[in-house]
Regions:
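Intrinsically disordered, low-complexity terminal
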Residues: 1-16, 23
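Polar/charged heptad-repeat coiled-coil helices used as signal-transmission/dimerization stalks
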Residues: 2-9, 40-58, 91-94, 98, ...
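Extreme N-terminal signal-anchor transmembrane helix of membrane signaling/transducer proteins, especially
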Residues: 14-42, 202-218
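N-terminal alpha-helical signal peptides/signal-anchor transmembrane segments
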Residues: 46-78
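Helix-loop segments that flank and shape redox-cofactor active sites
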Residues: 51, 78-86, 109-116
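Extracytoplasmic/periplasmic helical hairpin
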Residues: 70-93
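Solenoid-repeat scaffolds in large eukaryotic assemblies
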Residues: 152-154
Length: 234
């Protein structure tokens, strides 16, 4: 500190003012830099939450719901004898297939675009493969039901085909768990960063105030002390 005082004291008034201006500028730039970095970190975590993990979990939950409805409609088809009701079930099944494909495409797009989401690729592919096997047997199940062979259709649904459905559900649940962990971590990181940023900005602001005040005082003293000494001598 004494060295700084001596250096400032040896400067002319204009130089002293420039030192003060540069100090204020550097400290202000530091504060702005901290704010910018903090904003980028928070924004990154918010994007992960809003564009990756939250929508991914929503799509996975939609897939669970729609595939469950799909299987319910198949069972309804088996127990119905009214042609109109059976046609209605088939229409609903076709509609659900389309919705499942659309939702799956959205989930695929997110997973392809995010490296962390790619970690769930094996479970996702296994779930898709199991669902395709299950869906592939759907036409046969409905055809048997149409022909009045409900017992055979029911046996098919509760046998190997059901194992495919259970495999699909299991992999989907695992994937949901992994994505939920990522979502929770992103939320925690965003909250932690917000607190840290607040502390850093407050601390930096106080540091700027203290440093600029201290240097300003040193400069003021280096200007006024010689004048006071002259006045005292006179």
């Amino acid at each position: 500190m004494e060295k700084i005082k001596k250096c400032i004291a040896n400067l002319k008034v204009e130089g002293k003012l420039k030192v003060y201006q540069m100090t204020v500028l550097v400290m202000t730039l530091f504060l702005v830099l901290v704010a910018l970095i903090s904003t980028v970190v928070i924004r990154s975590n918010i994007e992960k939450i809003t564009k990756v993990w939250s929508p991914s979990l929503e799509y996975l939950q939609d897939l669970e719901t729609m595939t469950a409805k799909y299987r319910i409609k198949q069972y309804q088809h088996l127990v119905e004898s009214d042609a109109a009701v059976m046609n209605s079930c088939e229409e609903e099944i076709t509609k659900l297939e389309s919705q499942i494909q659309d939702t799956d495409a959205k989930l695929e797009a997110i997973m392809s675009a995010n490296s962390k989401a790619q970690k769930g690729r094996d479970d996702y592919d296994a779930a898709n493969a199991a669902w395709e096997k299950y869906r592939g047997a759907s036409d046969e199940i409905l055809q048997l039901s149409r022909e009045g062979k409900q017992q055979e259709a029911s046996k098919l649904m509760t046998g190997e085909v059901y194992e495919d459905y259970k495999s699909f559900s299991k992999k989907l649940t695992i994937l949901c768990g992994k994505f939920q962990v990522e979502l929770d971590q992103a939320k925690t990181m965003a909250n932690v960063c917000t607190v840290i940023i607040f502390i850093v900005i407050v601390a930096a602001g106080l540091a700027i105030a203290v440093v600029t005040t201290l240097i300003g005082k040193i400069i003021t003293n280096s200007i006024t002390e010689p004048v006071e000494q002259i006045d005292a001598a006179v």
